[in-house]
Amino acid sequence: YPFAEFQDKIEKAKAGQVPPPTPTPLPQGVEFFQPDPGRAGRTYDGSYYLGDANAPIVVLAFEDFKSAETAEHVKSVETKLKTDYIDKGTVRYVVQLFPVVAPRAAVAALCAGQQGNFFEFRNLLLTNLDQWTEGDDAAMQGYAADLKLDEAAFASCLADETVQTQVEQALAFGSSNIGVPQAPSYLIIKVDETGKSQDVRGFPGALPIEQFEQNIRELQAPPTPTPTR
């Protein structure tokens, strides 16, 4: 899936040629990835994020928790992004569910999120990638126990069809509306002071830390002045 095709979809969406429906209706005038002031650490579309709500750069990471590339990214790239950019207020890092292979694991992560442990659960899934199979709710319950979650509430959430629907809608939104070709894929977005997108760059597939850093620097650089005669 070539970069140019992915970027073309993004440019059309920015130009308003693609309608931007989301899994849940948004308040007027906001974008789906903006922080929801009513839910700490969540966006308006319900995704979880790390970092300052007012960071000038937003990274959207489209993830499948059974993806070896995603696991490697979290281990080798995200760690450095967190130290150098997320923790310093430069980047807000949003995990967008794109579970082509493991939708049930995505449901489990959302259930952990209901108890304030989305990232801890997601990291357990990716760290132990070869230790669980998609659809094995017993394994998911085991990870919930490892995190000392309320196991009854977790089990009830796993059986909640609305959470399953949320995951299905997230996958459909990423595929149909954003044009995400695979997991992982990334959008790096420069936002204005209101949190709305000014510039968007799309990258299908894994992205080395050097490319993240280069794009963050370029998006932060002031625009080149237009020469005057």
Model-assigned labels for residue ranges:
Residues 46-47, 95, 129, 200:
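Generic secondary-structure boundary/loop-capping signal
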